Amino acid sequence: MIVKPMVRNNICLNAHPQGCKKGVEDQIEYTKKRITAEVKAGAKAPKNVLVLGCSNGYGLASRITAAFGYGAATIGVSFEKAGSETKYGTPGWYNNLAFDEAAKREGL
């Protein structure tokens, strides 16, 4: 399906899967670059993290920081909808897919 922007009153109503993936990858790279010396030296860090509302905003940022900054195992909870033949998925759906793919690659 070709993704065409749907804008109503300056608000974009749909999401582009590749754009969401790129956004998540950028956040992951930013987090990896900013790991402090304390974390690298083995300072106290969370081992398991539950994030409610993990698909966008602070929740996604928290999950990325816990997983890619501290190496914690994460569980994310969110309510998102997948795309279909006639409708696009929610941005959080695509963000969660991108996070899961990146975490799997890193062995998290």
What are these regions (language model features)?
Residues 1-51, 81-82, 101-107:
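Non-catalytic terminal and boundary segments that flank Rossmann-like NAD(P)-dependent oxidoreductase
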Residues 35, 40-79:
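Canonical Rossmann dinucleotide-binding motif of NAD(H)/NADP(H)-dependent dehydrogenases/reductases
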Residues 71-108:
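Glycine-rich phosphate-binding loop and adjoining beta1-alpha1-beta2 segment
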